[in-house]
Amino acid sequence: MSLLLNHPVLTVRIHAGLNAASVLAGLAGLMRSPFFSLTELAREKFPALTSDVELVDSHVNGIAGVTCRIACPAPAGHVHQSVADIARMMDESTLSAAAREKADAVWQVLAKAEASVH
């Protein structure tokens, strides 16, 4: 997050790579507030979620920014989530109909990709 003319600016450095945590951090950084908790938001949307999501200040090559730290409890053994497990988590979520439709489409693409390599 850069400050330009006293307001936050979201800068995405595509050449450095882009992932969901980076996008989440950028958007959450725009709304940064002591009254806003990413963990609480995640648990509100996905009640079964036991992960902690934290916005953390970061510096890369002298440029200040933010990143997301996502801490998930490690299950015992080698665990896989099936499409049915993910669908159940989505069913338990409080996502809007539009967000749910997008999430389902993303998971279907990922499931097909996983199936093609196994």
Tell where the protein language model's regions lie, with residue ranges:
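Glycine-rich nucleotide/cofactor/substrate-binding loop typically near the N-terminus or early
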Residues: 30-118
